[in-house]
């Protein structure tokens, strides 16, 4: 039982408990990301494709993986896993020596998330599918959405390996 419950009420007690455990979960996430980064250093020749956008990420990822797997050993993020933590877990669990290409779906619910994913996987290729009004309630403006998706650009050194749509939808 939670001794403060009668004094502060259930809602505040839950909020208090959440504040107590939040740093623990954040530290655990950072540890998982660090382990994934270390594992990535063991694969210097791995080609990494990061796919972001408002729509079509999962479909494009699946189509690209299907086309490439006939000639290469390909690892891709499962289903619609597209967060830094989900990607880090996949790297730790599934990345093997024989993989030549890793295809990563990168989602964002706020600015900075695409950047953090790119810092983790260090992409060789970047794809932005369509930039639209998905998650407008979180980003507030289409400009903010566009800026979040464009965080991929500085990580692609060879701009011939960066694919961006000609217009937003």
Predicted regions and their residues:
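Phosphate-binding loop of NTP-binding sites
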Residues: 1-162, 166
